[in-house]
């Protein structure tokens, strides 16, 4: 969940201030990871000794979404600490407030895949979460931020509201698997496509010329 180096060949680091997703894709690798490292059936949440709190807050304006202030501690049936998890609610959308300072703490410029463990621009994500992530990115302009979504309409809504940052270090990607799917492109923004998994054949003229309109294509 932290600012981590990655083997993904088109970025150097991943950063997950928001994780979890409700798209329900059958081929989702992130959901499998969250289920693996989230709480197991034999574990339960462990409260902080000083505050008595677990550290999980619900979002009144976004049912099914959560905020955590730190990696949540887990205990076994005897109450003994076993480990901490960044996925206390499994793959439910979760904002990790304690990770917002990570870009600033990492001085060396990096190409950062933001929220590879979820979809920051899913319709269920509160606007304030997105704004908080953008603010954290803006405070550390030495990095290039790679955003990726299956819901490009959210990009458009934010752009029309003047809330989608412009700049050479803000890249907005759309995941598509077939040539008839929607994507985001707008003048003045760095945009790209991630065609993964590739489920249908593409040509230069597919999706209204998407392969030529965007700045970059990942296959």
For the regions a protein language model found, what residue spans apply to each?
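N-terminal [4Fe-4S]-dependent radical SAM core
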Residues: 1-111
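Conserved AdoMet/S-adenosylmethionine-binding subsite of the radical SAM
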Residues: 92-219
């Amino acid at each position: 969940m932290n600012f981590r180096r990655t083997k993904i060949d088109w970025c150097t680091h991943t950063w997950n201030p928001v994780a979890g997703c409700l798209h329900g894709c059958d081929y989702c690798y992130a959901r499998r990871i969250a289920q693996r490292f989230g709480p197991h059936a034999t574990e339960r949440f462990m409260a902080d000794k000083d505050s008595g709190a677990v550290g999980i807050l619900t979002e009144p304006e976004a049912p099914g979404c959560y905020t955590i202030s730190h990696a949540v501690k887990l205990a076994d049936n005897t109450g003994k600490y076993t480990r901490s998890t960044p996925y206390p609610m499994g793959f439910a959308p979760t904002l990790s407030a304690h990770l917002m300072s990570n870009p600033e703490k990492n001085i060396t410029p990096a190409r950062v895949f933001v929220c590879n463990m979820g979809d920051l621009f899913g319709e269920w994500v509160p606007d304030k979460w997105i704004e908080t992530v953008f603010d954290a990115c803006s405070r550390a302009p030495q990095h290039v931020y790679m955003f990726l979504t299956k819901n490009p309409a959210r990009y458009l809504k934010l752009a029309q509201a003047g809330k989608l940052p412009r700049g050479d270090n803000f890249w907005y990607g759309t995941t598509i698997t077939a040539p008839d799917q929607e994507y985001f492109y707008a003048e003045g923004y760095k945009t790209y496509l991630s065609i993964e998994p590739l489920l249908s054949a593409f040509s230069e003229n597919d999706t209204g010329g998407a392969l030529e309109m965007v700045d970059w294509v990942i296959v």
